[in-house]
Amino acid sequence: MLTYPNIDPVAIHLGPLQVHWYGLMYLLAFLCAWGLASYRTKQRDGWTSDMVSDLVFYGALGVVLGGRIGYVLFYEFDKFLENPIWLFQVWTGGMSFHGGFLGVMIAMLFWCKKYQKTWFQTLDFIAPCVPTGLMLGRIGNFIGGELYGRAVTDPNYPFGMIFPTDPLHLVRHPSQIYQALCEGLLLFIILWWFSSKPRPRMAVSALFLMGYGVARFVMEFFRQPDADQGFILFGWMTKGQILTVPMLLIGLWMMWYAYQKKIYDWGPQKNS
């Protein structure tokens, strides 16, 4: 069994001001996205560092607003009905990937209109930069002792640990680390490699949807469902899995469509 490091969830103390690791990870995620996207401008015609800075700003707004609103609508709508002001109490925690994803999609529409880029040109460009942010977010969850995994059933399992925030004090899967490695690091490597060569428009975005969909669906088997949600469908599917299925199906269709149309935005096959 592993020992939980029990890191102080507050990274920086400045008098009454406290900066939590989870918030710091969001900042690092946006900085990583900016750095990676800036590097990608060297390989793509028609992209500049100013465009990337604006793109990351729009994306950050989409993540924060969409993530919070999505969490409230998907997971805590009853609490919102009881106290609508709770929506704005972001310091109490609660962000949804699926809500953040939708928020980014909407934000990208405004950015595309400003810079005269198509939606999928933009998504294909930025998609490989996203998994590092997902990885850092899950590390933030781990440090905060939240969203831990299900109880370990095998007493000889070497990677289980007891989280101080778990009222039952059971040996659990460190599912945040599993997700950081699969939805974050592994997906980043796959997308970065795939996008390093010219691909049809929509193909990179499609691979992101499929890759995240598969990784999240599998990781949900290790993650403890929210106490007020439990298993929603068939006695074993969680809310996270239900929300991920459409992403996977849309990604499959997009990949098929991309290779049917074969529209290239860069490289020797670029369409004029």
UniProtKB/Swiss-Prot annotation:
Organism, as annotated: Acinetobacter baumannii (strain SDF)
UniProt cross-references to InterPro entries, sorted A to Z: Lgt
Enzyme class: transferase
Record-level GO cellular component terms: plasma membrane
Pfam family for this entry, one: LGT
Protein name: Phosphatidylglycerol--prolipoprotein diacylglyceryl transferase
Family listed: Belongs to the Lgt family.
Pathway named in the protein's UniProt entry: Protein modification; lipoprotein biosynthesis (diacylglyceryl transfer)
Primary location recorded for the protein, binned into one broad class: membrane
Gene transcribed to yield this protein: lgt
A biological-process GO annotation: lipoprotein biosynthetic process
Residues that span the membrane, as ranges: 17-37, 55-75, 90-110, 125-145, 174-194, 202-222, 230-250
Function: Catalyzes the transfer of the diacylglyceryl group from phosphatidylglycerol to the sulfhydryl group of the N-terminal cysteine of a prolipoprotein, the first step in the formation of mature lipoproteins.
Binding site for a 1,2-diacyl-sn-glycero-3-phospho-(1'-sn-glycerol): R138
Keywords: Cell inner membrane, Cell membrane, Membrane, Transferase, Transmembrane, Transmembrane helix
EC number: 2.5.1.145
Topology of the protein relative to the lipid bilayer: Multi-pass membrane protein
Coiled-coil features, chain-numbered ranges: none
Cellular compartment(s): Cell inner membrane
GO function terms (MF aspect): phosphatidylglycerol-prolipoprotein diacylglyceryl transferase activity
